[in-house]
C-alpha cells in the first residue's frame, strides 16, 4: 500500500513502570512490527505515560523516580519517548482521558514531541521537576482537524485487557470509548487467552475489529513485580532492565521491603472512585 494511504498511528502505553523493564520496551517493537506487517498502518511515535502517585498502588515509588528511569530506558530510542503529563496530575487520571489528551494534542497540532522529563537533564535543559507543575493542568478539549491526524492507540498486555472484568476497576463507558474511539494493540503472553476474553465480552466483541492481538512468539516473562522481588532479595536484575535503569536503582536504593509497603492498606484510586460513583448512582435511583 502507498505510504501516503496508510493510517499513521501513535502507540500509547500507560502503567506504573515500577520499574520500567526490557519487556516494556519490547511491547513497542512487537506492536510496531505487527502494525507495519498489516500494510495498513505506519507507526510514527511511541509514548510511555507513567501513572501519577495518586494511583495509590501498593509498592508504587514516587513518580519522579519512575519518570527518570523511563527516560533513561528510552534514551537511545529514536521513536519511543516519555510523556510526563499524566504523572504530574494531582489526582489519578482515567486511561481514556490520557488517550483523549494525546489525541487532542495531535489534532490541534500542539504536539511537542520529542518531550523529555525535566528531571533528566540533557544538554541545554536546566529545568527542574517542580518547574513543570505549572503546565500540568488538563487542557480544554479542542475540535479535531478533519484529516491527516494520526490515531492514538492503547498499547497493552493481555493482563490489562483481562482487567476489564475486575469489578469497579474500569467504568463500562470508558472501556467502550477506548475500544470504539481509539483501539487496542494487545501483546499476548503464553497462558493467556485474549481471544476467548474478547468473545465473552459483548463490548469487546462488538469492537473486535479495533482490537489487534499480537502473539509474542519469543516469550518473555519479565515483569516489574519480579524485578522488585529480586531487588528485595539482593539478587541481580542485570539484562532484565536497561543498564542505566539498573544503575539508577542501585544508586538511589529504590526497591526494598520498606518501599514495597508504600500504600499498603490503601484502596486503589480507580476502585475507590468507581465504587463511590456506583454507590452514589444507586442511591439516586
UniProtKB/Swiss-Prot annotation:
It is found in: Nucleus; Cytoplasm. It holds the Pfam family CTP_transf_like. Activity is strongly inhibited by galotannin. Inhibited by P1-(adenosine-5')-P4-(nicotinic-acid-riboside-5')-tetraphosphate (Nap4AD). Induction: By neuronal injury. GO terms for molecular function: ATP binding; identical protein binding; nicotinamide-nucleotide adenylyltransferase activity; nicotinate-nucleotide adenylyltransferase activity; protein ADP-ribosyltransferase-substrate adaptor activity. Changing residue 170 to A: Decrease in enzyme activity. Has no axonal protective effect. Does not affect ability to promotze glutamate and aspartate ADP-ribosylation. One of its GO terms (cellular component) is chromatin. Pathway: Cofactor biosynthesis; NAD(+) biosynthesis; NAD(+) from nicotinamide D-ribonucleotide: step 1/1; Cofactor biosynthesis; NAD(+) biosynthesis; deamido-NAD(+) from nicotinate D-ribonucleotide: step 1/1. GO terms for biological process: ATP generation from poly-ADP-D-ribose; NAD biosynthetic process; NAD biosynthetic process via the salvage pathway; negative regulation of DNA-templated transcription; nicotinamide metabolic process; response to wounding. It catalyses: beta-nicotinamide D-ribonucleotide + ATP + H(+) = diphosphate + NAD(+); nicotinate beta-D-ribonucleotide + ATP + H(+) = deamido-NAD(+) + diphosphate. ATP binds at residues 15-17, 24, 58, 157-159, 225-228. Its EC number is 2.7.7.1, 2.7.7.18. Catalyzes the formation of NAD(+) from nicotinamide mononucleotide (NMN) and ATP. Can also use the deamidated form; nicotinic acid mononucleotide (NaMN) as substrate with the same efficiency. Can use triazofurin monophosphate (TrMP) as substrate. Also catalyzes the reverse reaction, i.e. the pyrophosphorolytic cleavage of NAD(+). For the pyrophosphorolytic activity, prefers NAD(+) and NaAD as substrates and degrades NADH, nicotinic acid adenine dinucleotide phosphate (NHD) and nicotinamide guanine dinucleotide (NGD) less effectively. PANTHER family: NICOTINAMIDE MONONUCLEOTIDE ADENYLYLTRANSFERASE, NICOTINAMIDE_NICOTINIC ACID MONONUCLEOTIDE ADENYLYLTRANSFERASE 1. The keyword Endoplasmic reticulum does not apply. NAD(+) binds at residues 15-17, 23, 57, 92, 95, 157, 159, 169-170, 216, 220. InterPro entries: Cyt_trans-like (IPR004821), Euk_NMN_adenylyltrnsfrase (IPR051182), NadD/NMNAT (IPR005248), NMNAT_euk (IPR045094), Rossmann-like_a/b/a_fold (IPR014729). NCBIfam families: nicotinate (nicotinamide) nucleotide adenylyltransferase. Homohexamer. Interacts with ADPRT/PARP1. This is Nicotinamide/nicotinic acid mononucleotide adenylyltransferase 1. Residues 109-149 are annotated as: Disordered. In strain C57BL/Ola, an 85 kb region on chromosome 4 containing Nmnat1 and Ube4b is triplicated. The N-terminal 70 residues of Ube4b becomes linked to the complete Nmnat1 protein and encodes a fusion protein located in the nucleus which is responsible for the Wallerian degeneration slow (Wlds) phenotype characterized by delayed Wallerian degeneration of injured axons. Residues 109-118 have a biased composition (Polar residues). Divalent metal cations. Zn(2+) confers higher activity as compared to Mg(2+).
Amino acid at each position: 500500500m502507498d505510504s501516503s494511504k496508510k493510517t499513521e498511528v501513535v502507540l500509547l502505553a500507560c502503567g506504573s513502570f515500577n520499574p520500567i523493564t526490557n519487556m516494556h520496551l519490547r511491547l513497542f517493537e512487537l506492536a510496531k512490527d505487527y502494525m507495519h506487517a498489516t500494510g495498513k498502518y505506519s507507526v510514527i511515535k511511541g509514548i510511555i505515560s507513567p501513572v501519577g502517585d495518586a494511583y495509590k498502588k501498593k509498592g508504587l515509588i514516587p513518580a519522579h523516580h519512575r519518570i527518570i528511569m523511563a527516560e533513561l530506558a528510552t534514551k537511545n530510542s529514536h521513536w519511543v519517548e516519555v510523556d510526563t503529563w499524566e504523572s504530574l496530575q494531582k489526582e489519578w487520571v482515567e486511561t481514556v482521558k490520557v488517550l483523549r489528551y494525546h489525541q487532542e494534542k495531535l489534532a490541534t497540532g500542539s504536539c511537542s514531541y520529542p518531550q523529555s522529563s525535566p528531571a533528566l537533564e540533557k544538554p541545554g535543559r536546566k529545568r527542574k521537576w517542580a518547574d513543570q507543575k505549572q503546565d500540568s493542568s488538563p487542557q480544554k478539549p479542542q475540535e479535531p482537524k478533519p484529516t491527516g491526524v494520526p490515531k492514538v492507540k492503547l498499547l497493552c498486555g493481555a493482563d490489562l485487557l483481562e482487567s476489564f472484568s475486575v469489578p469497579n476497576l474500569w467504568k463500562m463507558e470508558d472501556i467502550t470509548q477506548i475500544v470504539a474511539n481509539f483501539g487496542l494493540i494487545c501483546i499476548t503472553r503464553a497462558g493467556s487467552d485474549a481471544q476467548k476474553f474478547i468473545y465473552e465480552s459483548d463490548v469487546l466483541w462488538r469492537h473486535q475489529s479495533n482490537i489487534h492481538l499480537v502473539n509474542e512468539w519469543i516469550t518473555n516473562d519479565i515483569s516489574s513485580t519480579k524485578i522488585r522481588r529480586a531487588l528485595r532479595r539482593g539478587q541481580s536484575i542485570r539484562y532484565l532492565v536497561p543498564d542505566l535503569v539498573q544503575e539508577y536503582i542501585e544508586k538511589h536504593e529504590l526497591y526494598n521491603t520498606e518501599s514495597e509497603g508504600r500504600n499498603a492498606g490503601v484502596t486503589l484510586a480507580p476502585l475507590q472512585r468507581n465504587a463511590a460513583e456506583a454507590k452514589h448512582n444507586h442511591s439516586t435511583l
